[in-house]
Amino acid sequence: MKRRELEKKLRKVRVTPQQDKYYTIGNLQWAIRMINLMGIKCVCDEECSAAEVALIITQFSALDLENSPIRGKEEVAIKNTLKVFWSLLAGYKPESTETALGYWEAFTYREREARADKEGEIKSIYPSLTQNTQNKKQTSNQTNTQSLPAITTQDGTPRFDPDLMKQLKIWSDATERNGVDLHAVNILGVITANLVQEEIKLLLNSTPKWRLDVQLIESKVREKENAHRTWKQHHPEAPKTDEIIGKGLSSAEQATLISVECRETFRQWVLQAAMEVAQAKHATPGPINIHQGPKEPYTDFINRLVAALEGMAAPETTKEYLLQHLSIDHANEDCQSILRPLGPNTPMEKKLEACRVVGSQKSKMQFLVAAMKEMGIQSPIPAVLPHTPEAYASQTSGPEDGRRCYGCGKTGHLKRNCKQQKCYHCGKPGHQARNCRSKNREVLLCPLWAEEPTTEQFSPEQHEFCDPICTPSYIRLDKQPFIKVFIGGRWVKGLVDTGADEVVLKNIHWDRIKGYPGTPIKQIGVNGVNVAKRKTHVEWRFKDKTGIIDVLFSDTPVNLFGRSLLRSIVTCFTLLVHTEKIEPLPVKVRGPGPKVPQWPLTKEKYQALKEIVKDLLAEGKISEAAWDNPYNTPVFVIKKKGTGRWRMLMDFRELNKITVKGQEFSTGLPYPPGIKECEHLTAIDIKDAYFTIPLHEDFRPFTAFSVVPVNREGPIERFQWNVLPQGWVCSPAIYQTTTQKIIENIKKSHPDVMLYQYMDDLLIGSNRDDHKQIVQEIRDKLGSYGFKTPDEKVQEERVKWIGFELTPKKWRFQPRQLKIKNPLTVNELQQLVGNCVWVQPEVKIPLYPLTDLLRDKTNLQEKIQLTPEAIKCVEEFNLKLKDPEWKDRIREGAELVIKIQMVPRGIVFDLLQDGNPIWGGVKGLNYDHSNKIKKILRTMNELNRTVVIMTGREASFLLPGSSEDWEAALQKEESLTQIFPVKFYRHSCRWTSICGPVRENLTTYYTDGGKKGKTAAAVYWCEGRTKSKVFPGTNQQAELKAICMALLDGPPKMNIITDSRYAYEGMREEPETWAREGIWLEIAKILPFKQYVGVGWVPAHKGIGGNTEADEGVKKALEQMAPCSPPEAILLKPGEKQNLETGIYMQGLRPQSFLPRADLPVAITGTMVDSELQLQLLNIGTEHIRIQKDEVFMTCFLENIPSATEDHERWHTSPDILVRQFHLPKRIAKEIVARCQECKRTTTSPVRGTNPRGRFLWQMDNTHWNKTIIWVAVETNSGLVEAQVIPEETALQVALCILQLIQRYTVLHLHSDNGPCFTAHRIENLCKYLGITKTTGIPYNPQSQGVVERAHRDLKDRLAAYQGDCETVEAALSLALVSLNKKRGGIGGHTPYEIYLESEHTKYQDQLEQQFSKQKIEKWCYVRNRRKEWKGPYKVLWDGDGAAVIEEEGKTALYPHRHMRFIPPPDSDIQDGSS
C-alpha cells in the first residue's frame, strides 16, 4: 500500500468513537519504533502485507512485559495501532479502534477453528493418538503439544512413528518447567541420535510454551547454515548446505538420499545452538537483578535474594542494607502494598509473616494444607488443582512465546536475569561490587540497577529512551546539546537550556518520575503564561554526581535541563573543536645557553626571512624575545626543491650540546610484510606536527634568534620559539612522547583497528564497514588537540607510506630511479649508497662496487670517478626499481623460512612464505677475518631477531650445502650461542677451505715476520733456502707477507708453519672467500690456484727447527737494513749531485746518523720522506766515482753501538768521548754510561730523594679539600687513582682504606711519607700480614711522593669543576675518579684504567707460564716413518695440537700424533725386573 493512500485511510479511523481524534502516520511510526525497541523487526513499507503484520502482533503479544518500560496504556496503544494497520491492509474499512478490534477477533477465531478442524482430521486418521487427549485440560504436556508426529512419506501420505511419539513425550517433559536448559540439552542429544532433519525440526516445534528458546536455536542454526554456504564456495567437494539441513526433501527422502554425515552435522548444529541458549539462560544473577515474580511466593523470593547476597564480596552492613531495601523495592505489587506501611527496618520475620498469603493459588493451598497438618486437622481439600479462575488460568494458560530482556534488548532471558549487571557501589558496568575501587557511596540515592544505555545496544536514531548517554567533560555547541540524566528512577533525555531556571519535562513523564507532588507554579514564556505541575525531592544522577532537585511538568515540545541541574554537572560550554590541551614537557640544560652571533644574509634571504617570521608570529608559533635575553642561535633560509619556496632553518648545534637529551620512542620503521591484512587501509599525514606541540615556558628563551637588517639599517629584531622548532635535538622525543598518549587513547577506544605511527605518518587499517567513520573519528580526535590532517594528505586503499606502496593485501617499494652522475662528490656517493641500502630488500645486490670507492675518503667534496662495475650496479638497481614486484603480507600461522645464499662479497637472504619471497636483503662481509661459520651464525641471529620484530615469532632456515658439511663445520666452532632449526638445499657451497691441517710428504715452509720501528721484515725458510723482504708495515702484515711469499714460490700442494696465531686462524678459515683488503686480498687471489695448503702453528722462540731459522732470518734482515747500498749501479761525475731512495725505514733515523766510507769522497745530505730515508750524494772529488749495485757505501751508527759499549765497559769513558770516537748521538752515549753498574757505584754525586715506580706499587697520602679529609692512593705504573673521604686522619681509617684497596686491586708495594698515621704499628702489622712491602720516603722531601702529589692537584681541579653539579663531596669525588681513570680528555692513547688492566693481564700470563714451566715434564716417544717402521725413542722438543716436534738424529722433525707413541722418559737407574 502506498504511503499516501495509507495516510488517507488512517485519518478516517477514530481513536475512540466518542472523540474526534483520528489516527495519523506518526502514531503508526511510533508503534513500529517501540516494536523495534523490543527486538521485533517491523518495517512499514509499500510491500508490507497483512499476514506479516498479524505475525508481528502475535509475537508482541507473546512478550513478557512484566518489568519493561512499556506496559499498561502504552502496551494497549501499540496493540491497537497495529491491529488498525492490519485491518487496513486486510481490506477492511474500520471506523474506529473498536471496529478494528472486532475484525481482529473474528480473524483469530477463524484461525483457531481451522486449526481445530485440522487436528480433528489427523486424530481421525490416527485413533491411537486420541487415547491421551481426554485429559488435555488437566495436564500441561498435552496442552503444549500442538505439532503431532505426522511424517510425510515418499508418496505424500502421512505416516505415524510410535518411537517418535515417545521421543516427543520425553522432550515435552524435559522442557515443561524451565524450557531449554542444560538438562534438556542432554536429553535432546540422546533422543535425536537416529532422527532425520525433519523429525528434529518437528521435535523442537512441539514445545510452543518455550517458543522463544526454539526461535533462538533456529536463528543460531541459520547462522551456521549461512557460514557453511560461504565456506562451501571454496570447498566444492564438501556436502551441500541444502543436504545438511534437508531442504526440499521429505523425511523418507532424508532418511534414504542424504548421508549419515549430513544428518549428523545438522544434529550437531542443533545441539550446539541449544547449549548456547541454555548457558545464556542459567547465569547466576546478582542481588540487584533479583525481582519477585507476580505469582512467586515471598519466601522463595527472599531465599533467592539471601543466597545472592551471601555470594557477594561486601561488608555485612552493606548486605543488611540491601536486604532491608531490596526485600521491599524488588517485591511484586501485592507484597509492596503490604510491606511499605511497615517500613524497611521491620524485622524479616514480620515481613515473611505479613506476605505469607501472597502468591499463586497453588502456593496458598499448599500453605493452608501445611498449616492444617501442623494443627492435626485432616485436610478436606482433595490434592487436585484448585478450580478458581486465577489458578486454572495459571496452570492451563496457552503457550508462552519467547522472552526478551528490555534492558539489553537480547532474547532468551528477562531483565532480572540479565548478565550485564552494574556495580551497586558506583553504578558503572563492567565489574562487580567486590572489585569496585570507587569510594563514592552517594550513588545509592538512585536505583543503581537501572541500566544505562550504551552505544553498542542502541543507535541515536531510535527512541529518546534508547539514545546513548552523552558523557563528555564539556558540552559542545556545534550541534544541539542533548544529554541524558537519571531522574526519578528513569533515564531522561533533554536539551541543555541555560536560560531555564528549573528542569522542565513533558507531561508524559508525570507518572514515571518518582517524587512528592508539589504546588503548581506559573511559567511565563514566549507563548505566554503556562501552569506547570511540580514534583519535589526528585533524585538525579549524572556520571558520578548526584543530588535532589525540583522538577516541573508542562506541555513542552522537548525536555529542558535548566540551571538548577546544570550548575552541578556542566563544567564549561565551548563551540571550538580544539578543546584538548597539550601539556608542555620540561627540558633540562647543562651550562649557559648558546650565544652564537648571527651571520649576515643577502637582501633576498633577508626579505624571505622577514615574511616567514611575520607568518610565524601571526600564528603564535614564535613571540618576541625579552630585552634581557642574552642567548642567540643563527638562522638562515634555503629554497625548497621543486616549489622554489623559502624555508627557514636554524643552526641548533650549540643548543643541542647543552640540552639534556631524551630517548626517542621510535626504534625504526615498521616492516611492511608484518602489517596485518585488512579490508580497508588509510594513510594520514599530520601537517606541521612539531608546530602543534608547545615548548616549555622555561626553555623558550634558549631558542632565541635574531633578524639582522641589511647594512645595519635599524636595530635587530629578536624572537623566540613557542612551539617545537625543527632541528632541535629534543623535538622528536617530545613529539613522540606527546602523540603516544593520544594514540594510546585511540587504540583503547578501537581495539580492533590496526594503527601504525611513525613520526607524523599514521596508517589505519580495519575490517569494519564503518572504516571511514573510524578514520574521521581519529582525525577529529587529533584535531581536538590541534593536529591538522588536511584532506589532500589522506590516502585510501592504495597508499604511499614511508617509502612503501601498500594495499589492504599486498605491498611493494615505491617505484623510483637512481640518478647516475659521473664524477660525483663523496657526499653524493654516500647519499647514493644510502638509497641503495634502503631498497636492498627488493634488489638484493651487494654494494661493494660502490662502497669500495669510499675507502679512506674523508673530504666530502672530493670528486670520485665511478668505475664500470659501480655504474653497472646502479643500472641493475634502476632496472628492478622501475616496477617493483608486489609481495604478500605475513599470515597468522603460516610457516616462515629464511633462505640463505652465499656470494663472494656477502650473504643474500630471502624470507619465504609458502615458497614466495616477502622480504630479503644482503648482509655484507666485513674485514674482521672471522671464519665463515661465525659470520653465518651471526647473520642468522640477526635475521631471526628481525623476523621476531616483524611477526613476533621465530623462523626456520634453509641453507646451501649438506647437513653433513654443516655439522662438521659446527663441531669446529667452540663458542656457539644458539643453533637454529635448519634445512638444506643442493648448492655448491663449501664450508671448509682449501687450507687444512698439516700433511706429511708435502714441502713445508716456515714463515716468520718482525718489526723494528716502522720497518717490517718477512722471511720464509724451506729446506735450507731463505727468502726475505723488508717493507714498511706492522708485525701482522709482516707475518702475512711471509705467507704470501711462500704461496707464490711454493708448489700446488704445500705446508705452511707460522708462529703467529693471527695468521694461523685467518688461513685456517678459508681467506679466499673473504673480500679482505691489503695482503689478505693477495692471499685470497693466490689460494684458488692451490690444490691443498696445510697450515700449522708452533710457538715462537722455543728452539723448534725451521721456525728458529726463519726467526734468525728476520733478525738478520732487520739488522742488514742499516748499511746503505744502491739498488742499481751509480756513476757520479765530479761535482755531480744525485738523489737516492735507500728503501730504509726506521723511526727517528736521520741522515747524520750514517757515516760514508773513508775511501769515497762523497758528501751526503738527505731527509725522511714518508718514513723512508732519501739521500742526496755529491761527488766532492776530482774523479768519477762508481758505486756498484748492493755495494755498501755508508753505514749507520747502530753498527757502532756494540763497539762503543764494549769500549766503555773496558775504560769507562765519558759520554762525550763516546760521541767523538764512535760517532754516536749524545742520548745513546749517555744511555750506555747509565747502564754501566760500575759507574753507578763509583759516583760521588749526593743521593737525593727517589720517586719509586713500578707495577702494583702504590703511593698513598692524605689531602684536604673544603674542610674534608681525602685519602688518596696512586698506582705508579699506570697513574690509576683511588680516593675516599675519611672522617679523621688516624691509622684505623688508613687501615680500612688499605683493606678496600686490596679488595679491588693488586697491591705488592705501598709507599708513603713519614706521617704518624702511615708509620703506626697498626699499618706495619697489616702490611706484614698481607705480604705487602711497606716503604716510606725521605722526611721533608716531597720528591719521594711526586706521583701522589701530582694526583692531589689533578683531583682538586676535578672536584672544583664538579662541585656545582653535585650535592655531596662523595658524589663529586666519584665523578672526579671516573674522569681521571677512564677518560682520555681528547688526547688519545690509553687511559690509566686500561694500562692497569694490561698489567693485570701480564701478571696473569706470567703466572700461567710459571705454572706451565713447573708442570712441564720431559716427554719421549716412538715415531713411525714412511715405511711404517717404528724408530726411537726420541726426545719431544715441543708438543702441539695434533703434532709434535722431536729431535731425530741431531735434527728436528715434525710428526703428527697419529704416527707417534709417547712413552715414559728412560731412566738408567731403573733395573731390569728379571734380575
Swiss-Prot record:
Q: Which SMART domains match?
A: ZnF_C2HC
Q: For the region Disordered, what residue ranges are annotated? A: 130-159
Known post-translational modifications? Answer: Specific enzymatic cleavages by the viral protease yield mature proteins. The protease is released by autocatalytic cleavage. The polyprotein is cleaved during and after budding, this process is termed maturation.
Q: Where is this site: Cleavage?
A: 126-127, 148-149, 367-368, 392-393, 472-473, 562-563, 1193-1194
Write out the catalytic residues in the record: 497
- List residue spans of Integrase-type Zn fingers: 1199-1240
Record's Pfam families?
Gag_p24_C, IN_DBD_C, Integrase_Zn, RNase_H, rve, RVP, RVT_1, RVT_thumb
State the DNA-binding region(s): 1419-1465
Provide the protein name: Gag-Pol polyprotein
Specify the species: Bovine immunodeficiency virus (strain R29)
Q: Which gene encodes it?
A: gag-pol
